[in-house]
UniProtKB/Swiss-Prot annotation:
It comes from Salmonella arizonae (strain ATCC BAA-731 / CDC346-86 / RSK2980). The gene is cysC. HAMAP family: Adenylyl_sulf_kinase. Belongs to the APS kinase family. CDD domains: APSK. This is Adenylyl-sulfate kinase.
Length: 201
């Protein structure tokens, strides 16, 4: 569909975002986890979602591998496809936040420009960038999917951190040390959500 198609008109919803948030008892936001492969994004995001669920918070976790089984199954790993992957996820995350959910996303999302586009789509007041900062050497040592080994052997091209660029966030809302215990990182994130009045104390 062309961006300028005059026959496509936005249909307003009778139920507002505020009304949905009141029903859930908390704000709808997007928590965007970014970092190298093996940094711990999915692990920390999953642990945080579990902690929020136990507090009766409505959540959904969008994981980089999982969306490629459906929503983004037709995309590869070229620069263009990776950009489209993040665009699609950003659109879905924005809709879920409109529904009043706390949306957790775990994607390498190596380029600042793409993360900025998602932030603009979601809204600056509903987007929290979370940088899981783990040294490359530690990520390689973890290598849960064996991808670094393949990249070092030349079997994977344009792999982020090896021969593909990763642009670290310049001013994330929270900067996590990926070598800390997951429980410590979850505590830091819960504190952030309380300070932002996203969840109750």
């Amino acid at each position: 569909m062309a961006l300028h198609d005059e026959n496509v008109v936005w249909h307003p919803h009778p139920v507002t975002v505020t009304a949905r948030e009141q029903l859930h008892g908390h704000r709808g936001v997007v928590l965007w986890f970014t970092g190298l492969s093996g940094s711990g994004k999915s692990t920390v995001a999953g642990a945080l979602e579990e902690a929020l669920h136990h507090r009766s918070v409505s959540t959904y976790l969008l994981d980089g591998d999982n969306v490629r089984h459906g929503l983004c199954r037709n995309l590869g790993f070229s620069d263009a496809d990776r950009k489209e992957n993040i665009r699609r996820v950003g659109e879905v995350a924005s809709l879920m936040a409109d529904a009043g959910l706390i949306v957790l996303t775990a994607f390498i999302s190596p380029h600042r420009a793409e993360r900025q586009l998602v932030q603009e789509r979601v809204g600056h007041d509903r987007f929290i960038e979370i940088y899981v900062d783990t040294p490359l050497a530690v990520c390689e040592q973890r290598d849960p999917k064996g991808l670094y080994k393949k990249a070092r052997a030349g079997e994977l091209r344009n792999f982020t951190g090896i021969d593909g660029i990763y642009e670290a966030p310049e001013s994330p809302q929270i900067h996590l040390n990926g070598e800390q215990l997951v429980t410590n990182l979850v505590s830091q994130l819960l504190d952030l959500l309380r300070r932002r009045d996203i969840i109750s104390s």
